[in-house]
Amino acid sequence: MKPFPRAEISSRALKANLKRLRQIAPGSKVMAVVKANGYGHGLLNVAEVLTDAHSNADADGFGLARLEEALEVRAGGVSARLLLLEGFFRSEDLPLLVEHDIDTVVHHVSQLDMLESVSLSKPVTVWLKIDSGMHRLGFHASEFKDVYQRLQQNPNVAKPVHLMTHFSCADEPQKDFTATQMAHFNALTQGLPGDRTLANSAGVLYWPQSQADWIRPGIALYGVSPVAGDLGSNHGLEPAMELVSQLIAVREHSAGESVGYGAYWTASRDTRLGVVAIGYGDGYPRNAPEGTPVLVNGRRVPIVGRVSMDMLTVDLGPDAADKVGDRALLWGKELPVEEVAERIGTIAYELVTKLTPRVAVCLD
């Protein structure tokens, strides 16, 4: 018996998206970003699908936020290059990086101090992060020369040191700040050895000059556009997730009757309501407004009333023939998650990563 609700993950779409991103950035290696449980698609699901060399759809490496994520990927048998995008947090983490062959970002002086205070069995591969304008992590231009020299002189650091930055506005292509960041990064790193990586998903899709040695696609890998008002399908990408549930009740509803907590919505006509087995306890946003679409039997029907913990209600219409057990699609190929996110007033990243453990993640 299939569980409901569930997130159906398409291995074919994941592979197709990786192939498409390689076409968009043919001169770059791909560091597939699988942090936050593979953007809600299942960390090992994604890593294993994209290390299938027999399918010609294997990533060159994987980007993760936390050491625990990287260790889970290694324990799952994935031998590809791994990069900790937030770097290590404690000096005790460094021997684990060596043992499991994990690259690390270095973005703060405290990490330099830890690298200089330990004795390691072999050097760690480091990606030095430059703050080119994001002002979140990374070293300023005034610090760069000294930091780079410290890394070069440290026997615990493998040579060459690799170089990276992160864009703050690449998902707003009308702004020229990304070009400013690229120029800043290139001026600081000109002539230095080592690989470079600048481009996140928006960089890959909208700023081809940023693609460099490695690209770091995250949301685009899952078939979703990083840009408001855009769809992944506009770039030849396919959504890898379909969030589905089912109708657990169909009810006759009279004009003037309300539904749900707070009697928030009142019917203006006689109709039929459907109750869908998903709610904010599953990660579907409680603040989804009236009219947010759900797909039932191939047609869009609006949410009515408040989303509750385990259920939401949709207006099926007065002539609906839908029945208990019918499939309800919350987002997917026929109902893009970008559109649902815009309707709710959030971003697709948040929707796919906030699904709770009650939602079964099922790889096809």
UniProtKB/Swiss-Prot annotation:
Key words, A-Z: Isomerase, Pyridoxal phosphate
Catalytic activity field: L-alanine = D-alanine
Enzymatic class: isomerase
Organism: Shewanella amazonensis (strain ATCC BAA-1098 / SB2B)
Cofactor(s) the protein needs: pyridoxal 5'-phosphate
Enzyme Commission number, as recorded: 5.1.1.1
GO biological process, one term: D-alanine biosynthetic process
Single Gene Ontology MF annotation: pyridoxal phosphate binding
SUPFAM superfamilies associated with the record: Alanine racemase C-terminal domain-like, PLP-binding barrel
Residues where N6-(pyridoxal phosphate)lysine is found: K35
A cellular component annotation (GO) from this entry: cytosol
Binding locations of substrate: R136, M309
The keyword Chaperone appears for this protein: no
Pathway where this protein functions: Amino-acid biosynthesis; D-alanine biosynthesis; D-alanine from L-alanine: step 1/1
Known function: Catalyzes the interconversion of L-alanine and D-alanine. May also act on other amino acids.
Pfam families to which the protein is assigned, alphabetical: Ala_racemase_C, Ala_racemase_N
This protein's name: Alanine racemase
Cross-referenced InterPro entries: Ala_racemase, Ala_racemase/Decarboxylase_C, Ala_racemase_C, Ala_racemase_N, Ala_racemase_pyridoxalP-BS, PLP-binding_barrel
Active site: K35 (proton acceptor), Y261 (proton acceptor)
Family under the similarity heading: Belongs to the alanine racemase family.
Domain of life: Bacteria
